[in-house]
C-alpha cells in the first residue's frame, strides 16, 4: 500500500509540474486548500561541513525556515508574495550545517493571495572546503503534512495542545507524512520582472509596554498608546489546558503548560488596541506579561 501511494504521488508530480516563475520548481501538499498550514521536511547527508551554503527560497504564502531545529528565517514575518510579485530570498545557512545528517524544515501558511499549490520552491547549494560543489532542491522526495490545530484564513488559529516542536528534528517519527507534488495548472501565475524586487527583512524594532489596560471577567482591551505594526505577545502561566483566547479575532488554544506565549505567528497587524476575550475560568492573573512587538516596516 505504501509503494502504491508513493507511485500515485509521483505520477501527480509529473502530470502537474509545468513552467515555473524565475526557474522555480514548486512543491505542494497533494490535497491543498485555502487555509491549511503545511509542514515540510527533508534530511540531507553532507560528506563534510560546508565552507559555504545558501538556500534560495520562494513561496506563494508565508514561511518559516529551520535548519537542524534552529530558526534561520531572516524576518520575523516572512511574506512570500506581494501584489502578485514573487519575493525570492537567498539565505546564508553555512553556520547551521554540520557533517552528516542535516534536516531542513519549512513551516508554510497561506498568503494574502490564495494560491493553493505554489507553496514552496527551495534550492540548497554551496561548496565544501575542497571546492567541491553540492546542489539539492525541494522535490517529490521531501515529506509534508498539514499542521494539526493550525490554520490561517485572514485570522490565525493555533492550538498549542497539539503542536510539537519536535517535527523539525531529525529524530522525529510520526505518521501522516506524504510526498509533495508539483504545482497545479489552475493556480496563480506571478508577475515576471527583469530584476527581483528589493526585499527588506522586517526585524524587531521595539518592545512596547501597554499604555492603558481595561479588564473585566470576559476579557480585556490593551492600548499601546500609538499604532504600530507587529503583534501583541502574552505570557501565560497556569492556564487550564484547552482554554481559548481570541486576540483581535485570532484564536489561541492553551496547552496547559506552566508558561506559554500567545502571539501572531504568521502575520503582522497595524494596530493600536488589542481586544482579548477568554473562556470562563481564565483570570487576569494568568497573564504574567503583556508586550507589543513592533517590527520594522
Language-model features, listed with the residues they occupy:
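Bacterial Sec-dependent N-terminal signal peptides
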Residues: 1-21
